[in-house]
UniProtKB/Swiss-Prot annotation:
One of its GO terms (cellular component) is cytosol. Pfam families: Glycos_trans_3N, Glycos_transf_3. GO terms for biological process: L-tryptophan biosynthetic process. This is Anthranilate phosphoribosyltransferase. Its EC number is 2.4.2.18. The lineage of its organism: Archaea, Methanobacteriati, Methanobacteriota, Stenosarchaea group, Halobacteria.
Amino acid sequence: MNINDTVERVTDGADLTVDEAREAARLVFEEATEAQIGALLAALRAKGETEAEIAGFAQGMRDAARTIEPDREPLVDTCGTGGDDYDTINVSTTAAIVAAGAGVPIAKHGNYSVSSSSGSADVLEVAGADVEAEPPAVEEAIETDGIGFMLAPVFHPAMKAVIGPRKELGMRTIFNVLGPLTNPAGADAQVLGVYDPDLVGTIARSLAHMPVEHALVVHGAGMDEIGIHDETVAAEVDGDEVREFTIAPEDLGLDRAPIEAVSGGTPEENAADLRGIVDGSVTGPKRDLILANAGAAIYVAGETDTLAAGVERAAEAIDSGAAATKFAALCGDDEAVEGDGEAASTDSAAASTTAGPEDDD
């Protein structure tokens, strides 16, 4: 198999198998020229990427990544594609911290912002976290603190090969959806937001081809998160089975609120909201939005039998101080962590623009 033959086949309308797509990704990262990469990406876009092709490219991207193997399970990631319609508070990042407070081991994959005001790396950097930590340090953090952050450019250096072709093409390609599928810690469970409701089923069926045990793929009426302003389109992946459904805020025991009530701002403003939500001083719609998404992470980890029960556990993690303790650990505030033994015990009881998740918050 060579890249030119693959481009020709895809241009003629042929679909690649998972294994063929995985090999095509290897060729992209190791051998292909920028012209060949651009031709393949454009051909896939014109044909329409299949679930098998997305899964194969994701596995090929994982093959090329710097990976870690923390001795914690089930590892959970809360990572979206970015590219949605709203600049909200940093949802997936805050939700990950709250879920960690509920005892869920978190391997958070993220990046700096591309087009939104504040990506996951932007807000965590402002808060004091070492967002560019090397793989061994992140592995240790997950094992010791129950939460670690993996910056996409640090863990996916092979993605440099596609920077030029993607910029020149100037359109969305298969790589716009791959970041959340390529967790370098091999997360067992995920809450994965997508920018287009039509992608929910496609990405869920792609995950069913991959070694992920339990996942929720969601689109919340314009958000790549579970929303509280309207119903969320969702697909649950349990092994190789996929179930599509909708989530209403009322199903989670939460009130609806207009999208404007959860608007974000600069990284500094979003970091202040993050801190306030995890320490309990920020309430109302912003807290509820985080509870919805943290509850989903707790659910896919197998800690609860329902999403609504996950929301209740998320609220307990905030109210007990456990979420604030995890935030302090992520930001390297050892004094705060050591000073809150009760909250800490909850865990034991229970080139950035193209390298991975884009605008994930």
